[in-house]
C-alpha cells in the first residue's frame, strides 16, 4: 500500500501556520512538503478570478462585503491576515508552477467558463484538477475541456454507504466525466473505496486534521488526504512508512532502512530540493 497524496487545504492553513488561501499559506505548504495545493475560486464584480472560500470578505479579512458586488481593487485593499492580500488566481498558478499541482474548487457554476479559460491562458492544464460539489459544474468543465482531470465533491451522505450506494456513486462520478471522488472523511468505508478502485476512480478524503483519522484513512487505502495541517500529516505518514504499514513512494524508498532522525534529515533535503526547482 502506498501513502496517499498530501493535499494542503487552502494551503498550510491550520492554526499557527498561515492565513487560509493566501500566497503565504501556499508557500508554507510547499516548504513543509506537499503533493498538491487545494484552493477555492470566486469571481469579483468586475469579472476577475480570485482565491477565496467564502462569498464575502467578512470571515477571512478585515473588510466586509460580498465578493460578487465588489471590484478587484476594493478586495485587494483588504488584509487577509498577517498583511497578506486576497490573491488572484494567476498569482497562485505562478507560485505553484513546476512545484505542485493545484486542486481547484469552483465555488459557483456560472464561472466554469472563466476558470477553464484562465487555466488555458496560464498554460496550466497539466498541473490542475478541477472540482465542485455541483455535478453539473463538473460536467460543464469536462464539456469545455475534456482533457482536464476533474473531481466530484461529496459531503455527508444520508446513511453509511452500502455497496449498492457505492455503485450508484461510481455511476454518478463516471457519468459526469470525473475520475476522482473527493468525499467527507467521516463518510468513508473500505467497501466504498474498493468499489471506486474497481472502476479506476481515485478517492480523496477531506478535511482530515486529527492524527488518528489520518492514520486510519491512510491504512484504509484512500489515495489522497486533504488537511489544514500538512506538517502533522507528514509525520503520520513517515511513522507509517517506518513501521512498514505503507510503502514509501519511489523517491523515498532509499530511506526505508535508515533511522528516524536520519530519515527526517533526508526528507528535509528532498523538500528543499523540490522547493528550489
Where are these regions (language model features)?
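Phosphate-group recognition and catalysis centered on beta-loop-alpha active-site segments
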Residues: 1-277
Amino acid at each position: 500500500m502506498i501513502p496517499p497524496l498530501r493535499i494542503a487545504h487552502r494551503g498550510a492553513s491550520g492554526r499557527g501556520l498561515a492565513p487560509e488561501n493566501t500566497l503565504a499559506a501556499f508557500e508554507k505548504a510547499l516548504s513543509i512538503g506537499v503533493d498538491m495545493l487545494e484552493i477555492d475560486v470566486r469571481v469579483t464584480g468586475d469579472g476577475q478570478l480570485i482565491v477565496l472560500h467564502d462569498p464575502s470578505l467578512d470571515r477571512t479579512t478585515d473588510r466586509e462585503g460580498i465578493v460578487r458586488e465588489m471590484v478587484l481593487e476594493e478586495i485587494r485593499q483588504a488584509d487577509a491576515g498577517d498583511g497578506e492580500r486576497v490573491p488572484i488566481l494567476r498569482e497562485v498558478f505562478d507560485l505553484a508552477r513546476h512545484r505542485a499541482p493545484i486542486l481547484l474548487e469552483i465555488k459557483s457554476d456560472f464561472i466554469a467558463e472563466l476558470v477553464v479559460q484562465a487555466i488555458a491562458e496560464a498554460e496550466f492544464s497539466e498541473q490542475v484538477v478541477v472540482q465542485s460539489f455541483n455535478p453539473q459544474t463538473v460536467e460543464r468543465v469536462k464539456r469545455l475541456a475534456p482533457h482536464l482531470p476533474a473531481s466530484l465533491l461529496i459531503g455527508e451522505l444520508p446513511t453509511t454507504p452500502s455497496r449498492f450506494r457505492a455503485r450508484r456513486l461510481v455511476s454518478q462520478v463516471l457519468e459526469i466525466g470525473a475520475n476522482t471522488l473527493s468525499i467527507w472523511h467521516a463518510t468513508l468505508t473500505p467497501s466504498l473505496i474498493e468499489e471506486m478502485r474497481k472502476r479506476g476512480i481515485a478517492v480523496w478524503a477531506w478535511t482530515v486534521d486529527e492524527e488518528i483519522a489520518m492514520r486510519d484513512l491512510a491504512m484504509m487505502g484512500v489515495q489522497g488526504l486533504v488537511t489544514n495541517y500538512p506538517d502533522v500529516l507528514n509525520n503520520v505518514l513517515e511513522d507509517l512508512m517506518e513501521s512498514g504499514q505503507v510503502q514509501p513512494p519511489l523517491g523515498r524508498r532509499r530511506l526505508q532502512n535508515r533511522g528516524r532522525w536520519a530519515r527526517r534529515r533526508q526528507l528535509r533535503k528532498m523538500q528543499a530540493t523540490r522547493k528550489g526547482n
